[in-house]
């Protein structure tokens, strides 16, 4: 089992409370990001890594000052906002900056692992094309590849 650590800096992430996610990228988004990273690896190396799961490790979470915006629930509310009516429904828009890592666990053969090691900097460049919905994603530093990290514990020591 191997681990790829992808440092991330996500800004303008919508962290308003909702029924689906409260303040953090959903588990589907994290899993999707890890899966997309493995697709990039497959496309660049020809290797076929087996996805063993992904996790988001948050190192720093900065909540930005919020602003009120009109709710998009009904046309009547939008008309009230345009007229300056104080009875218009408003909601708080909350944005944040999230710093941390996406930890991607995968299995792969020795030749595939060698291909990944050889192209790690090119893979890093390609990962900049991925994104979280509703925010701006950057990968501020180089990727870390941990070979033989059987239980994933080495990833969390970094």
Give the location of each predicted region.
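N-terminal ordered "arm"
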Residues: 2-73
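Context-gated lysine
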Residues: 42, 60, 69-75, 80-83, ...
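Acidic-enriched, low-complexity/disordered segments with a strong bias for Aspartate over Glutamate
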Residues: 43, 51, 77-79, 85-87, ...
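Internal, well-folded beta-alpha domain core
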Residues: 98-158
């Amino acid at each position: 089992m191997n681990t790829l650590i992808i440092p991330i800096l996500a800004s303008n992430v919508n962290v308003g409370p909702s029924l689906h996610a409260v303040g953090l990228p959903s588990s589907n988004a994290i899993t999707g990001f890890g899966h997309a990273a493995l697709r990039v690896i497959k496309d660049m190396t020809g290797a076929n890594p087996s996805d063993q799961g992904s996790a988001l490790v948050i190192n720093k979470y900065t909540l930005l000052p919020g602003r009120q915006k009109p709710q998009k629930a009904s046309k009547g509310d939008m008309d009230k906002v345009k007229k300056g009516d104080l009875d218009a429904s408003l909601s708080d828009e909350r944005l944040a900056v999230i710093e941390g890592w996406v930890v991607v666990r995968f299995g792969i053969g020795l030749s595939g692992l060698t291909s990944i090691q050889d192209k790690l900097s090119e893979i890093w460049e390609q990962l900049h094309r991925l994104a979280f919905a509703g925010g701006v994603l950057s990968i501020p530093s180089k990727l870390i590849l941990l070979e033989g990290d059987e239980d994933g514990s080495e990833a969390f020591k970094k």
